[in-house]
Every structure is written in C-alpha cells, then in structure tokens.
C-alpha cells in the first residue's frame, strides 16, 4: 500500500484567519488516493493582537522566538530546558518527504546517514516541504531567529521516503501533486533508524490501508530494541466523505500499534485551548496508546529559510499548518528531551511516563477522544512514584517537610541555606533536591500566658523537715483520688495533680526532693538554696533547656560534705513540638517525644556569696535539642552535655546580684543521613539585680536580663548523595553540614515587683523581648502583667 502525508495549511494574519490549502491522508493498497480539498471557510474577523512585550533577559527561555513557536510553551517544555535538556545527543528519525539540508534550523545536526530510503538514489532534499515542516516542530534551532522545536538540539536522521516524483507530479485524474509513501520505503526508513541509534521515529503519515508484512516486521524490530514510534492519528475528522472511521486512528496507525510492542504512540490534535481539533481523528479503540498534542495553527511556512510573511489588503499574514502531522513531532520531541535528560530510561518507561503524566482532557481519565490526555512535558519531567535518596533505601517524600526546628534554633529554618542531595524516583531518574527547603520553624514559645493562667489550686504544707507542695486541677476520673485535701466529692472525682513536689530530710546532711510534672533544675535550686525569682518571661539560664517540654517525674538528692554540697538529679519527660498546621495548630496540637536528663552539681557558700556548678546529660530518643527532622535526615535522637553555673552575691543595703550561665554541646545520633560527627554548641545566660524592702516592707524588686538557650555554632553533619552516574548507576556521596545557628538573638529584659499582702500577694511584671524566639528582625514583644493572689 501507499500512504500520504497528514496535514493542512492555513494562512493567518493580524486580524483574519482563512483556509488556504488542505491535504488530507489517503491511500490504499494501490496507488496514492488524495482527498479533494473542501471549500475554504469564510474569513473570521478577530481582534488584532497587542504589541509584543519587550524582549526578556537573555537567560530566559521565554524569548520572542519561543513565543512564536507552537508547542514548547503549550506543552511545558521550559521545565525540561531549565533542567538542561534540549535533545542534544539524541537521534530522532523522521520518515517523511525529506528535509531542507541548507536550512539554518538544522545546521550541524543532520545525521550523516540521512538520505533517500526508496532506492531512487536521490540526494537529500524535500520537494514538498512537509518533512521539513514536521522536523522544524521537533528540532528547529533555538537561535532567536524564527521558531524553535521542542528538542532544539536533537540530531536529525532525515529519511526521505516519498515515491520519486509523487510530490511534484499529479497522479492521473488529479489536479495537483500529492506525495505518496510506499510501505517498503517506510520499512527501509525504520530499519535504517534502528541501525543508526535512533531513540524515537516520527511518522507523520497515514492511510486507509494496513501495513504490509515488511513494515510490520520493521516496526516490531524497532520497538523490540526499545525505539519509540510516534504516528499521526489521521485527519478525517471533518471530511464529508472520510476514507476511514474518524472516531478511530487511521488503519495505518492501528497496524503500526498492533506490531509495536507497546511502544507506539498515536497522536491526535488539539488546539491551543486544549480542545480536540475538528479535523483530527479520535483515540477510539486505541485510547490507551493515544496522546493528544498541539497540531492546529502551527507556525509557520518558510520562504528563503525564514518565516514567509505577505501583505494583503494592508495587513501582514503568515501561513500556519493544521494536522496530526504536527501533533506527532511534538511528542517525538518530548521523547528526545526525556532520553537526553534521563539516559537510563528504557523506551517502555518513556512511553509510560508520557502517557501517565498527560494532563486530563475530556471525560475523566482515559477516553475515546483524547486518549490518555494532552502531552505535558513538565509533568513528565517531575519525579514520579516513590523517591529515595540515591544509593540508599531512605524514602524522601516530595512535598513533605524536612522537619521542625526548636526554640534554640530560632529562625534557622528561614535562612534559605541549601542542602542539596540527589534523589531517584521510581523510574531511576536522578534529581537534585534541596532537603532544607521544607524545614519548618517551630512557633516561638509562649511565656506570658502560661505563666499567668492558673487552672488549679496550689496547696503546700510542712511538718518538721518534710515539705509538700502541689497544685490540682480538673482532670479525668482515672487519676488518683485526693480526699486528704478536703475536697468535695465532686471535686475529688475530677481532680488531678498538675504538678507537685515532696521534699524531706533523710539525715542531717542529706535531703531529697521528688517532683511530679516539675523540672529537676527547680528542685536542685531549691535544695541548694539558690533564688529563682518571680520572672515571667526572662528565664534563669540554669532552668532553660531551650525547647518546650513537659517534665514527667523528677528526683533530686543533695548531700552536704563539709563545706560543699553535692547534688544529683534525674528527670524524664516529653519534648513538645508544634509540627502541625492549620486547624490542628489552632487547637494547640503538639507532638510529644521522650527525653531523660541526669545531672550532678556542687554548691558552696563563701561569706555573702553563693556559688553552684553543675553538669547534666540529656538523652533524646527522636529529637535533637527539641527539634525533630525528617526521616531522610535522621530521627535517632541526640545526646547533650550541659555545663552551668550560678553565682549570687548579697550586697549592702539589701541589694543582691546574681548571674547564671549555661553552655551546651549536642551530638545528633547517627542514622539515615546523619554521621553523628556534628556538634551543636549552645549557650544561655541571665543577669539579676534585686532589692528587698525597697517600696514596702518585705517587697522585692528585681531586674533580669537574659538570653534563652541559643545555638551559637555547628549543625548536623550529613553524608548525602551528591552525584549520580547514569552510565554506571553509581552514586557519589559527600559530607555536608546543615547549620542550626540562628541569625536572631533574643534578649529578654524584665522587672518584677512582688508585695506580700495579708493572705496572699500582689505582683507586677514589665518585660521587653528583643527578637523573640531568636527570630531576626521579629517585632519586639512588650508587655506588662499584674497578679493578685489569695489563699483560701
């Protein structure tokens, strides 16, 4: 049989669109059969387009040439270009009427084995222009002159398959010439493409007859070798007397698909609104193998190797093309881009990618009109399926977050520091990804409101050397009953311990303190006789682990050995972290992760001065100084060492001076990408000045300037995949560090005044937090609080 090219040619001007010529697919088992062009539709008046925008920067792919090119923008090719793909090094076979070898659009990129495959021995050329026009859609050069193709750097294997003379001499009984293509020549072109390393073969031809044995065998051989075939669906959609069913691809396309081992893609045409072109055949029974692409109003006819423009009635026109002939090369160009960008992809994988990434059109899912949908190069280039760090089995969830930092890390999540690594998707494609991009900062700690809100009742008592203090509030009835507090029966059923402490002397030199929901640091300070102050926002450095936590149980024991006190303490509880967003965040939802703390300290009084020095060890099971990172970074917890000191000096006139310092070293445990070799250095400090009986008897005025715990240097040491070799499948790893030191530095200044009153006390606090939460340039937090409390 012979087949014919599938295209239509139009002229388009600034305000008028009209049909100029039309050539439809024809053919059969005998000679070439060409349809008679229908009458041209009447002119359609459209609004003149606005003037073009100013030229974009040279680094932009959206150039004036790009805007003239029909396909790259519509199909999202810029994503591929930004990834460095242009088709370079990929051979695209084009079986058609030949190519203009002198055109600047293909200079230096026409394969040496291009030529006549009919046996006629003709030189490389193109009597009709159809092959050149199709090839421009695939691979016209990006040179800022006219238009450029989808894969503008691809190598072109131009295979001239038109029957000699058919494009220039009209067949008997016909008014004009129409190119004819015999199966034997098409088969020869397919075989030559296979032999010369083509990754994809474009066949913008069609006909009413099925392929012969030689062609079916050639298609089978090519696709068995992993070469993709893209063939036009046909242009019988609006013919009055179609040669074959317009609701299905042409019999020629169906025959190729039947022999194609799943690697034949059939191309239907859509317009630039994504609607099926009225001339296009539909996907029909081969909807699972059909992809729609732009094939309507494709720019432009050339003359003298440039866009042909002509004037008519005072207006300038260009000629554009319609046809599934121009849908197919859009897809072939996309194949070339994928093949260059991801050389390890097989033909089957590329076909599957293009079909499954198509943007839906028509009825939801695959349908009988658009097939799998409209070609979407951007989506085809996006990672697909499960993504993992290259060279590992560690899953990296795209669109997920890299974790949530803690208070001591402040604004580090907003620092935009890159943490690049290579991931592989389910197709084995390598991508460079910034693992730090999804890092979230925890909400700054709320200090004033929790300090003021009292939801329970404070109770304390002392008997000899034993002291008991706790607060109670509403809770569930599963907690222990508290009848000894003389609560009503209703209160007993609802009461739970919010926090409590029992302190007692074991001997003259030894005293212990047992706490429930109380930090061990506070019990240590009480046993040592160190003042803590009545501050709401400025924290004593020794009390500050930096992150939000909920102590569970704690215990401290102090023994006096001569002039020195030795104190040991333990604490277990939960680090709390705001990891959620939206409504869950509004509901104050927090994640909880266990920690344990062990400490030992020394204290001594020297005249009017008191000194304390301590060392503590913090173990976190899943967090790092209160932060929790994604699984691909590591979630094996951390261990920290803190050294802290406190000094208080009683001055003359009831004045006193105090200072605290804490220095920390945190080591993230190895796991996933963490090497365990990084160290975070952190510190906190506070300076106190106070005066008793300043304004009233036994009142106390105190000033504190403090910095909450803050990471000062260091971060996470990571071993990350940094390069991937497609040729060998080998991954190269490199050492990287994610700094966790914030730019901001919170300094909290607070004045507290406490006045005892009969049956209670009155207090007021004035505070000023600069860069609260260690967030650089965050608005200052200013406030004042008043409290009046009575015991009943």
Q: Which residue ranges define each predicted feature?
A:
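C-terminal motif of bacterial Sec signal peptides marking the signal peptidase cleavage site
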Residues: 21-24
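Substrate-binding/access-modulating region of protease and related hydrolase catalytic domains
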Residues: 26-38, 86-87, 161-261, 305, ...
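Subtilisin-like serine protease catalytic core
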Residues: 49-58, 78-92, 97-113, 120-182, ...
